[in-house]
């Protein structure tokens, strides 16, 4: 059975970089998928779905639920790796509930933990506005993305805490410290 770890955090928390490094360090057993990268790749294809995704992401809004869930599940099932890291998911209560429902309806994948990389809003803002990745990285859109992240956060945290799946990692440290702690935690689950 595949082990799934969801990695959440504010825009600029470092969740994608952390997950990339962990999967690179453990390439035999760990696959990493960034929800954002999966959606950007689909958007770049300029298909009907891609254009729809672009319409939402360019405004900092959430992509429709069915498109995101379909994209996530496809990535998990197509992977040959035993441990799957997905960052940037869930970003809404609806996404959380939809994934929970899908995972409960199958026996190929088990959710082991939801890891939250916690950073202050100031740190997130400095990191996002200091990088240039596309049209979505300006101050107005950053604030919208923070709102989209923060609005459902307490409910998402409480849902996973009740299932004893929520883990917080301090994202205000060096990348080496964060990756080390997260990697040790993930690998502690064994088989």
UniProtKB/Swiss-Prot annotation:
Q: Name one Pfam family in it.
A: ADK
Its annotated compartments are: Cytoplasm
Q: Which Gene3D superfamilies match?
A: P-loop containing nucleotide triphosphate hydrolases (3.40.50.300)
Q: What is its EC number?
A: 2.7.4.3
What enzyme category does the UniProt record give? transferase
Pathway the protein contributes to = Purine metabolism; AMP biosynthesis via salvage pathway; AMP from ADP: step 1/1
A Gene Ontology molecular-function term? Answer: ATP binding
Chain positions covered by the region annotation LID = 130-136
List, in alphabetical order, the GO biological process terms annotated in this UniProt record.
AMP salvage
Q: Which InterPro entries match?
A: Adenylat/UMP-CMP_kin (IPR000850), Adenylat_kinase_CS (IPR033690), P-loop_NTPase (IPR027417)
Q: Which CDD domains match?
A: ADK
Q: Where are the annotated segments for NMP?
A: 34-63
- The UniProt entry lists the main location of this chain as cytoplasm
User: What the record says about its domains?
Assistant: Consists of three domains, a large central CORE domain and two small peripheral domains, NMPbind and LID, which undergo movements during catalysis. The LID domain closes over the site of phosphoryl transfer upon ATP binding. Assembling and dissambling the active center during each catalytic cycle provides an effective means to prevent ATP hydrolysis.
What NCBIfam families does this protein map onto?
PRK00279.2-2
User: What's this protein's family per the entry?
Assistant: Belongs to the adenylate kinase family.
| Task performed by this protein | Catalyzes the reversible transfer of the terminal phosphate group between ATP and AMP. Plays an important role in cellular energy homeostasis and in adenine nucleotide metabolism.
Please describe the quaternary structure of this protein: Monomer.
* HAMAP family referenced in this protein's UniProt entry, alphabetically: Adenylate_kinase_Adk
Q: Write down what this protein is called.
A: Adenylate kinase
Upper lineage ranks? Bacteria, Pseudomonadati, Campylobacterota, Epsilonproteobacteria, Campylobacterales
- By which gene is this protein encoded? adk
């Amino acid at each position: 059975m595949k082990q799934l770890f969801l990695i959440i955090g504010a825009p600029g928390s470092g969740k994608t970089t952390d997950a990339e490094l962990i999967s690179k360090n453990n390439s035999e057993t760990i696959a990493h998928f960034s929800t954002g990268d999966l959606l950007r790749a689909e958007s770049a294809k300029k298909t009907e779905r891609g254009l729809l995704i672009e319409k939402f992401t360019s405004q900092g809004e959430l992509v429709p639920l069915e498109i995101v869930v379909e994209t996530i599940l496809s990535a998990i099932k197509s992977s040959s790796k035993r441990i799957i890291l997905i960052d940037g998911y869930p970003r809404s209560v609806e996404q959380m509930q939809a994934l929970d429902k899908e995972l409960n309806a199958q026996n190929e994948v088990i959710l082991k933990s939801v890891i939250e990389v916690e950073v202050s809003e100031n740190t997130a803002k400095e990191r996002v506005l200091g990088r240039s990745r596309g049209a979505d990285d300006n101050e107005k859109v950053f604030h919208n993305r923070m709102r989209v992240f923060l609005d459902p956060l307490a409910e998402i945290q409480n849902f996973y805490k009740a299932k004893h799946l929520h883990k917080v990692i301090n994202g205000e440290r060096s990348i080496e410290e964060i990756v080390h702690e997260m990697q040790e935690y993930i690998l502690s689950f064994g088989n």
